[in-house]
Amino acid sequence: MEVNCLTLKDLISRPPRLDFAIEDGENAQKENIFVDLSRMAPKTPIKNEPIDLSKQKIFTPERNPITPVKLVDRQQVEPWTPTANLKILISAASPDIRDREKKKELFRPIENKDDVFTDSLQLDAVDDSAVDEFEKQRPSRKQKSLGLLCQKFLARYPSYPLSTEKTTISLDEVAVSLGVERRRIYDIVNVLESLHLVSRVAKNQYSWHGRHSLPKTLRNLQRLGEKQKYEEQMAHLQQKELNPIDHKSGERRRDGCPDSQDPQLLDFPEPDCPSSSANSRKDKSLKIMSQKFVMLFLVSKTKIVTLDVAAKILIEESQDIPDHSKFKTKVRRLYDIANVLTSLMLIKKVHVTEDRGRKPAFKWIGPVDFSSTDDDLVDVSTPVLPELKKEIYGHVQFCAKQKLARHSSFNSEQASERTQRKVNSEPSSPYRQKQGLGVYSLEIGSLAAVSRQKMEDNSETVAFASQNMMPLPSSLDPAAPLPSPSVDSEYRVSPLCHQALSAAQTDLKALPAQNGLNGQGGVSLASMALDVEHQPQPLAAAQPLLYVPPAPLFMLCGGLQEGLSPGSGSGSGSVGGGSEVTAAEQPPMPSGQKRLSKERRLQEEEEEPATKRQCRDHEDGPLSLVMPKKPSDSADIASPKTSENRASAPHEDTHMNGQLSAAKAVSGKATTNGFVSSEWGNPCSNTEIEKPSEENESTKGPSPLQYLYVQPPAGLNGLSVLLPSSQSPHAVGLPVGPLPSLSIQYMVLPSPALSGFPVLCSPTMPGPVSSAPSPLPNVGPVNFGLPGLGSTAHLLIGPAAMVNPKSSTLPSTDPQLQGPCSLHLSPVMSRSHGSVQPGSPAYGSLPAATVKLQQSPVPVTPKSIRCTHQETFFKTPGSLGDPVLRRKERNQSRSSSSAQRRLEISSGGTD
């Protein structure tokens, strides 16, 4: 019963406890707990007694009121204070805190039950485990780092996208896909934009460019960093850190006066920030800071930059107050930039040891060597527009002259820079050009003498020839005459026989060794100022060929005439062969000025006295055929007596001594000298080419014509002069007198068809190539020299600017002026720097040369004038009418009063 009574007492006392529990649950937020405490006041001394959990079940009802001890703790945890609203705001702002509060509320209804203490312990354990799970779900600091995020960002796009591929970046989509805030993506994009890897298109829209322009951007930043003198500032700050006391006085002085470098530092000539004031937000943007941060690496000698130094430089540059808060902000922003640059593999983190310990720094591992001439030089090897060619031609030729004068085989001074500038800057004035080239004329003789002396002293002729014929490594070097025609894909032309056939390099190298000193198409080493705008062209079928880049002027001629005695001369002349090339070094002329100056040239050649002609020839003479180094203006024949002494004679004697060969002066038999001479410098001496024999078709019979081809000089009418020389040597009569004249028939052709033609020399072609359809209609090959020689060296002229081997891109014309005229040339002004004398070692093996002129069948001018009595040379539709000759006569009579009398061109031609 007693037990039951206790049970009844318990039942009687339960309702108020349940009411209290319900009231407590309903009014927990109303702080009504103090009412119960007042009722419990008499038993307060017992609440501090230790609680035995093992005896909790058998406690008497009198001791039950001590159970709300936890309620007192709740009172202290959740007071109603003015800051209670702050907790509500935090709970609303953070879902994590709100979730914690909900988890706590789940256990509150059972706090006052019998097992309240055990449940409270379980509550604490569950709460801790929930926090641990939440921490596991939250990403770590490394996972949230900007560097790792940038790597994920860069992995979405190719480093080197195709030019046709256009990639647009949406920052919203990227932020959602990567699960980060958009501001983090903005930080990455701003740094990438500073290096021009991306560009802004619209709001939150960027275009991806990749790393194509990164080297150029870094080079520009390096130049800007050098202008801003960042290297000096870094050195100053490092010295200041080492000796802080020494710099205090300097700082006080600097406070009083403004820094002289501030205007330069504020001037940031980036196209993206035209107005970069010191305190503008744009100057403090992450993009500008990134560019300046990269500049510090590029101008640093050690390529290591600490963030402290970088922050100080940027703070001083932006004229901010150097307080600690701004410094920490700068360092924090520089860390963000450094993380992105690290992801780009441009820098890496290192540690620098100082007096106070190790300090983190960053080292540049990106590209370092930026060539300063990348965007200054023009790649002339690639096909460029004609306008660009005209602009850079003078610069290329000017550089060619400088390198030519510094060649090791010469002992001459370089011409003055002012004269070179005058020559290049006034290409439209023929008279100025003659004055400009007069300075070079003093060097020509000595150069020719030196090269001739070296050739005579060298006994191993074949080795010498092969040594001189090998191309030099530099593609822009004027001394590199023989680029390989079969290597590059750009070396394409219209074939002579409408076939595109290539020659091997071994054949190309074997040709000078076989024929370099035997007169079979040797090409001078340093005579070629390579015109890189013209590229090698296709060749004839399976023949080793020699490529000569097209010079502004070509004279092509062949070997010796019949009947020459082998022992009549010593021959210091053309050991190099029957055809030589001297590249012109003058820039091309506008075509509009060529017509006027061509007629002037013919008038001056007719009317210039022999004395002035001789004096001018002394100034503008040609070089030796063997090793011409400077532009030459005429080709003549030297006597064997002067040829013997030519090597050791000074350059004045080289220009002035014995002008006629012994064969011409004594027996009328003359050598046919062939070389390519540059006529750009002296337009008045363009047609001063002496041929010892005139064309005589009746006596020579079926033998092909021999001629000299003279390409038009700069500023003239685009006319080429062809001087046939197949006339019998007995037909040449030399009158007795100090200034005898020689009557030579010549042909005037429009030069646009021949202006860009390279010369292809082959020693293996047994006969003339006449089966190919010629651009000049029915033009047979022209042979030079002895017809009875076994092998012939063929000089093939083809258009130079060919894109397709089957089609010609050069516009060509039929002859505008074809007419026989007699050129009365004075032998006194003749010179034979490149003549092959009968006694020379090259005399016996000098072959004939076949010259073919190729031209597209479409004429530039509608007129097709035909020479009636020279049908074997050029057979073209139309006829060579008298109006052309009458026009010449009018031009000659119009300028008959001129004191410069050079040539007498008669109206009637000689056969």
Swiss-Prot record:
Residues bearing PTM Phosphoserine: 94, 409, 840
Biased composition (Gly residues): 566-579
Residue stretches of biased makeup (Basic and acidic residues): 243-257, 415-424, 599-621, 688-698
Any GO BP annotation: placenta development
Binding region for DNA: 141-210, 281-366
Predominant cellular place of this UniProt entry's protein: nucleus
Molecular function terms, GO-annotated: DNA-binding transcription factor activity; DNA-binding transcription factor activity, RNA polymerase II-specific; DNA-binding transcription repressor activity; RNA polymerase II cis-regulatory region sequence-specific DNA binding
Coiled coil, from the record: none
Origin superkingdom: Eukaryota
Location(s), subcellular: Nucleus
Annotated domain remarks: In contrast to classical members of the E2F transcription factor, atypical members contain 2 DNA-binding domains and regulate transcription in a DP-independent manner. Both DNA-binding domains are required for DNA-binding and are proposed to form an intramolecular structure that is similar to the winged helix structure of the E2F-DP heterodimer.
Family assignment from sequence similarity: Belongs to the E2F/DP family.
Protein known as: Transcription factor E2F7
Organism of provenance: Bos taurus
Lineage, opening ranks: Eukaryota, Metazoa, Chordata, Craniata, Vertebrata
Gene: E2F7
